[in-house]
Amino acid sequence: MGECPHLVDVRLGHRSLATGPEQSDICHTGSEARWTTTWYGSLSFSRHKYKMLADLTPGVEMSCRHWARWLTPVIPALWKAEAGGLPELRSSRPAWTTW
């Protein structure tokens, strides 16, 4: 199996074994299911353990899902802490024409 940068949702029948934040958008990256790590309660299955689970457990449905990635808001206070100060304002005029 190939590698996938997304999290995996393991399902046995209709009951999901994975827990954690809501996941969406099934990842179709090829003809075979791709995966990295999944969570079962507080245990993390590594790639090797997950492959063993999939190979030894009939009826396991593997689907690769990823979390929605959102842009993080820019916080000026963090700029001050990381860059040693706020960026200088070049002009108070907008860069494009506003009507």
From Swiss-Prot:
One GO term (biological process): positive regulation of cell population proliferation
Protein location: Cytoplasm; Microsome membrane; Endoplasmic reticulum membrane
Domain of life: Eukaryota
GO cellular component terms given for this protein: cytoplasm; endoplasmic reticulum membrane; nucleus
Keyword Membrane listed: yes
Keyword tRNA-binding part of the UniProt annotation: no
Alphabetized UniProt keyword annotations: Cytoplasm, Endoplasmic reticulum, Membrane, Microsome
Tissue: Expressed in the heart, kidney, liver, pancreas, small intestine, ovary, testis, prostate and thymus. Expressed in all of the cancer cell lines tested.
Main subcellular localisation: cytoplasm
Physiological role: May be involved in cell survival, proliferation and progression of cancer cells.
Subunit text: Interacts with TSPO, IGHM and IGHD.
Name recorded for this polypeptide: Protein MOST-1
Organism of this sequence: Homo sapiens
Organism phylogeny: Eukaryota, Metazoa, Chordata, Craniata, Vertebrata
Name of encoding gene: C8orf17
